[in-house]
Amino acid sequence: MQIKKVVLLLLYLVYPQTKCLSQTLYGTNNYVEYQVGNLPIVISVPHGGDLIPTSIPTRICNNPETVTDSYTIETAEQIKAALFLATGCYPHIIICNLKRTKLDCNRNLVDGACDNSQAMTAWNEYHNFITMAQNTANSQYNNKILFVDLHGHGHTIQRIELGYLLSSSDLELSEATLNTTTYINQSSIKNLVLNNRNNYTHTQLLRGPNSFGTLLTNQGFPAVPSQQIPYPGATSGYFSGGYTTANHTCFDPAVTTNGFQMELNYDGVRNSNSNRMLFADKFKNVVLEYLNTHTNVVLGSCTPLAIDENNESQFIFYPNPINDVLNLSCSKDMNTLKVINIIGQELFNKEVNSNKVQIDLSNFSSGTYFIHVTTGKTIKTVRFIKR
């Protein structure tokens, strides 16, 4: 199993431009997972898991925080779906499936795993997956990627908190002070300050018109820091970023990636499926605009190709665009086929158990569709056009 994981990852690194599929790599006992993507977006979710294996004792070392960030995994999945519908491709997502009572991946190894060997293994696999994802994305997109450590907060004020490793009091400082080398070097977007296409200053990137917080607020989700809410205020709660942000962004001199910790409020964002879907759709707008504005990465049409070059399971479909009949072939038997429209409705679902299939789509309206092909535990997704 471990050899297969490594082979799959290496194949993905060799062919980053030719895949647009949702493939998941799992750590030991499925305690952590890496949903492989091909967008310049890496999202980690450390506190949404619910697994409570009896072989891992409840954490009691060093006064641990054990509260679950409810519905953060579900929110990440909605973000993934929204980005896929917009671009045809996926963000990289790393998830800890263990409940926080068993493991905290946003702490150092000692405090997070409390010296339990299974928890320590999961902690290491989680952070290795983040590094793998960032290396893959940075290689494909010339180090112009964004990392988001996704959390949920329980503070009274219902707004999104963006943590750039600057304290609440730091954010109250003047523009001139925040733009000094001292504070730039403390920031998790340090490299973006040094190299962004519009030469925006540190303060402008934190709370200017094109900052992430301002763009979120403009989409109907108040965020701090932003042009509208430049700093949290001394009497309100605020999370500035934790272990993951400090070790997987350019705050660490050995890392090139820009990023931040994103703490989502509960009401209106995480508390229902409809709210999570709405937020994911707006987040999609924001992250694509943010990358385009600051890094010149344009992702309006990330078109998947028709050939999966993974030697273990070669998949081809043709023609594209199609008139009536879609032909599919695979080096292994395909188990199920699904056709989904651009708004996520499933229009076709069939068990096939064959390596060659023809689908009659003559009754489909003209437009863009996605086909999901299941082969064993792998799901391949590609986009096609019906004339």
Language-model region placement:
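Residues in and immediately flanking transmembrane alpha helices
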Residues: Q17-T18, V110, D333, S354
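Bacterial Sec-dependent N-terminal signal peptides
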Residues: M1-Q23
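C-terminal outer-membrane/trafficking sorting elements
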Residues: E309-R387
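Short, compositionally biased serine/threonine- and acidic-rich segments at solvent-exposed termini, linkers
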Residues: C302-P304
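N-terminal catalytic or cofactor-binding beta/alpha core of small enzyme domains
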Residues: C20-G300
